A protein has these predicted regions:
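Short, flexible helix-to-coil linker/hinge segments that flank and couple to helix-turn-helix
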Residues: 102-106, 117-143
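Acidic catalytic/metal-coordinating carboxylates
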Residues: 47, 73-76
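Two-component/phosphorelay signaling modules centered on CheY-like receiver
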Residues: 22-43
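Conserved acidic carboxylate
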Residues: 19
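Short amphipathic alpha-helix used as the core "switch/output" element in two-component signaling
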Residues: 53, 75-87
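Acidic, metal-coordinating helix/loop segments flanking the phosphotransfer/catalytic sites
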Residues: 44-62
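Active-site residues of response regulator receiver
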Residues: 66-67, 94
């Protein structure tokens, strides 16, 4: 298994969104689509179980994961990914910005942590940073 290399450019054109709020999914799908001139493929999963099932059969360039999911914490999925697919980058997009949760997500293997409360311009800039190999962490969660 190859670990994720932070110096590698991340592909956002094939993204798995692990999010149980359909409005947030649509928002992120639109942001990702606006960033590319070519079509993008975004697949959504509304639970940990659904995400694991998709990840066992499909390839992605990036996983965007929420922390609060109906069947557990997105941090569990990040840890699972580190064992199953360590080269696949995972970024948290959550409304939970508590320092302890941010640290747990990063320790589990997330390469970035973004807050949903940011406007589309800020989230778009953070996603572009990820695409170029950056590892953005929202300042509100990095206190």
């Amino acid at each position: 298994m190859t670990e994720f290399d932070i110096n590698t450019q991340v592909r956002l054109d094939e993204t798995l969104l692990v999010e149980d709020d359909p409005i947030i999914c649509l928002r992120l799908q639109r942001l990702l689509a606006r960033m590319h001139s070519a079509p993008v493929r975004t697949t959504t999963a509304d639970s940990l179980q659904a995400a694991r099932g998709i990840l066992e059969t499909d390839d992605f360039g990036l996983v965007l994961v929420d922390i609060g999911l109906p069947d557990g914490s997105g941090i569990d999925l990040i840890g699972w990914l580190q064992h199953q697919r360590p080269a696949l980058p995972c970024v948290v997009v959550s409304s939970w910005g508590h320092e302890q949760i941010v640290l747990e997500a990063l320790k589990a293997g997330a390469i970035g942590y973004l807050l949903k409360e940011r406007d589309d311009e800020e989230l778009g800039a953070a996603l572009q940073s990820i695409q170029r190999g950056g590892a953005p962490i929202d300042p509100a969660g990095a206190r």
